[in-house]
Swiss-Prot record:
Record's function text: Forms part of the ribosomal stalk which helps the ribosome interact with GTP-bound translation factors.
GO annotation (BP), single: translation
InterPro entries: Ribosomal_uL11, Ribosomal_uL11_bac-typ, Ribosomal_uL11_C, Ribosomal_uL11_C_sf, Ribosomal_uL11_CS, Ribosomal_uL11_N, Ribosomal_uL11_N_sf
Oligomer and partners: Part of the ribosomal stalk of the 50S ribosomal subunit. Interacts with L10 and the large rRNA to form the base of the stalk. L10 forms an elongated spine to which L12 dimers bind in a sequential fashion forming a multimeric L10(L12)X complex.
Ribosomal protein among keywords: yes
Modification(s) after translation: One or more lysine residues are methylated.
Entries under HAMAP family matching the protein: Ribosomal_uL11 (MF_00736)
Protein name: Large ribosomal subunit protein uL11
GO molecular function: large ribosomal subunit rRNA binding; structural constituent of ribosome
Keywords, ordered alphabetically: Methylation, Ribonucleoprotein, Ribosomal protein, RNA-binding, rRNA-binding
GO cellular component, as recorded: cytosolic large ribosomal subunit
Amino acid sequence: MAKKISGYIKLQVPAGTANPSPPLGPALGQRGVNIMEFCKAFNAATDGLEKGTPTPTIITVYADKSFSFVTKTPPATYLIKKAANLKSGSKEPGKISGGKIARSKLAEIAEIKMKDLNANDIEQATKIIEGSARSMGLEVTEG
């Protein structure tokens, strides 16, 4: 018989740096999850990612206080900023350009994000990522 689910916790945790301090500690503590056990498991699971990369995580908490978690790919905005070597997007998207990014780089990001996007093929995924880049105030160039 399957375990009874007590609830879900959605967090964005930096890869490889999970520790019991806020916001992680209080969110897990409220549900009665062993915080150190989660931190060790999460840090081991995100070992392959660059340290500090924001990682969306969905934690399933069961009635017996055990847990399981699923990590998603980093947010598109993080990957776009990293590819375009930016600290942040434009303060006024549509009026002030925040920089430029090549469509080929957006396609690479779309390949990374493909499993988390609601798209049937890579072209659709690229258009989704392109929309995110434009909403950040970036100009999309060919190439």
